[in-house]
Amino acid sequence: MLYYPHIDPVAFRLGPLKVHWYGLMYLVGFAMAWGLALYRARDPKRHWTAQQVGDLIFYGALGLIIGGRLGYMLFYDFSNFIANPLTLFQVWRGGMSFHGGLIGVIVTTWIFSRRTHKRWMDVTDFVVPLVPLGLAAGRIGNFINGELWGRVTTVPWGMVFPNAGPLPRHPSQLYEFLLEGVLLFIVIWWFSAKLRPRFAVSSLFLLCYGLFRFTAEFFRQPDPQLGFVAFGWLTRGQELSLPMIIIGGFALWWAYRHKER
């Protein structure tokens, strides 16, 4: 059994301003995405400029933050949102949803593609390899905050988290760091290193993230305000990941069936 290391969630202070590790992880994620995008843009076959990369990161960040927060309120805290809609803007209280962020990024990349006269599917194929390392950084932020812990376990690496009772739990944030962050990055970066059929990279991302998240949810404690949403075992995260698996699998088949490259 391991004990949570009790990391101070505040990274440093600038006078009265507290800079939290979780916020820094978002900055790290965006910085890594920007760097990877600039690296990929150096390939003349991809037809991207540094200016377009900078604009894309801005659009992506906007969609992620707005969609992530709105998605959390709608998917995970709807009753509180209806009772007090202003909680949407209380971001300091925490609460971000990957699936909401995904929808937000879909919308903003579509707007970006319209303004730059690029095909939306080409834009998403360029974007998705940049995402997993940002997800990895976010899960490290969750771990530092001591939140989103796992279910009670007897495995040797079970960890006692503050505010989660005396029993050891799966460090599910680290499982998601490895699955949705490291492993997903390796798979998507390798797959996207060569030009693939249009939307194949995006489809594989949807499929793999959905599978990895669905698996990780078996070790993660369900949100207390929701519990299991169906069958006595299905969580909201699994419910939202199922469409990703189905759509991703079908879209990957479609991409290779209708090759445009």
From Swiss-Prot:
<protein>
    <recommendedName>
        <fullName>Phosphatidylglycerol--prolipoprotein diacylglyceryl transferase</fullName>
        <ecNumber>2.5.1.145</ecNumber>
    </recommendedName>
</protein>
<feature type="binding site">
    <location>
        <position position="139"/>
    </location>
    <ligand>
        <name>a 1,2-diacyl-sn-glycero-3-phospho-(1'-sn-glycerol)</name>
    </ligand>
</feature>
<comment type="function">
    <text>Catalyzes the transfer of the diacylglyceryl group from phosphatidylglycerol to the sulfhydryl group of the N-terminal cysteine of a prolipoprotein, the first step in the formation of mature lipoproteins.</text>
</comment>
<keyword id="KW-0812">Transmembrane</keyword>
<comment type="similarity">
    <text>Belongs to the Lgt family.</text>
</comment>
<feature type="transmembrane region" description="Helical">
    <location>
        <begin position="56"/>
        <end position="76"/>
    </location>
</feature>
<feature type="transmembrane region" description="Helical">
    <location>
        <begin position="199"/>
        <end position="219"/>
    </location>
</feature>
<feature type="transmembrane region" description="Helical">
    <location>
        <begin position="19"/>
        <end position="39"/>
    </location>
</feature>
<dbReference type="GO" id="GO:0008961">
    <property type="term" value="F:phosphatidylglycerol-prolipoprotein diacylglyceryl transferase activity"/>
</dbReference>
<dbReference type="InterPro" id="IPR001640">
    <property type="entry name" value="Lgt"/>
</dbReference>
<keyword id="KW-0808">Transferase</keyword>
<dbReference type="GO" id="GO:0042158">
    <property type="term" value="P:lipoprotein biosynthetic process"/>
</dbReference>
<dbReference type="GO" id="GO:0005886">
    <property type="term" value="C:plasma membrane"/>
</dbReference>
<feature type="transmembrane region" description="Helical">
    <location>
        <begin position="126"/>
        <end position="146"/>
    </location>
</feature>
<keyword id="KW-1003">Cell membrane</keyword>
<keyword id="KW-0472">Membrane</keyword>
<dbReference type="Pfam" id="PF01790">
    <property type="entry name" value="LGT"/>
</dbReference>
<keyword id="KW-0997">Cell inner membrane</keyword>
<feature type="transmembrane region" description="Helical">
    <location>
        <begin position="227"/>
        <end position="247"/>
    </location>
</feature>
<feature type="transmembrane region" description="Helical">
    <location>
        <begin position="92"/>
        <end position="112"/>
    </location>
</feature>
<feature type="transmembrane region" description="Helical">
    <location>
        <begin position="173"/>
        <end position="193"/>
    </location>
</feature>
<keyword id="KW-1133">Transmembrane helix</keyword>
<comment type="pathway">
    <text>Protein modification; lipoprotein biosynthesis (diacylglyceryl transfer).</text>
</comment>
